[in-house]
């Protein structure tokens, strides 16, 4: 067995890094990442955007949903290198710091669409994507069907469905339609 000196291992790691350039929440980001780094890890650990949660690491719960080029994706099964050259929006990017909440965020607040809040960022990102894809007049059935990949262990979903329906209508009245 050959043992490599420590500096050789460090050099190999540098060589194996991938350079990525992307837009995150409207800001250009350039970074070197291990090609195996998940997008959720990159967002949370490298960029300190901790609103995107890791609930299952298996694409089952939806707590990690972000928008990649305007479409909802699960960041726990998306490699950071797959976002190279693309635009990512996280829950932090929906509303400006210190500014008003996004209409969907406001609807979740008004209609008590959360309890512990762990699933909420993923639910909201999924809901915004749903409105962009299906329009503002959503039936309860459509909302529930579209939420199949998002799990909540607290609320029983009724208030989440009400929140999404209200948020969809509010988005129709805003510039964020």
Question: Which positions does each model-derived feature cover?
Answer:
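Signature of N-terminal electron-transfer/Fe-S-associated modules in redox systems
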Residues: 3-177
């Amino acid at each position: 067995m050959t043992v490599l000196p420590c500096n050789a291992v460090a050099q190999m790691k540098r060589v194996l890094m991938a350079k990525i350039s992307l837009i995150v929440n409207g800001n250009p980001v350039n970074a070197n990442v291990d090609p195996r780094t998940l997008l959720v890890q990159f967002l949370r650990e490298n960029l300190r955007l901790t609103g995107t949660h890791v609930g299952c690491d298996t694409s089952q719960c939806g707590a990690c949903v972000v928008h990649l080029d305007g479409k909802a994706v699960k960041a726990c099964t998306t490699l950071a290198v797959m976002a190279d050259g693309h635009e990512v929006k996280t829950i932090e990017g929906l509303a400006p710091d210190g500014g008003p909440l996004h209409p969907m965020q406001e609807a979740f607040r008004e209609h008590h669409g959360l309890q512990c809040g762990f699933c909420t960022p993923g639910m909201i990102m999924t809901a915004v994507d749903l409105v962009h894809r299906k329009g503002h007049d959503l039936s309860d059935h459509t909302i529930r069907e579209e939420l199949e990949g998002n799990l909540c262990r607290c609320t029983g979903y009724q208030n989440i469905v009400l929140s999404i329906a209200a948020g969809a209508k509010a988005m129709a009245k805003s510039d964020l339609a």
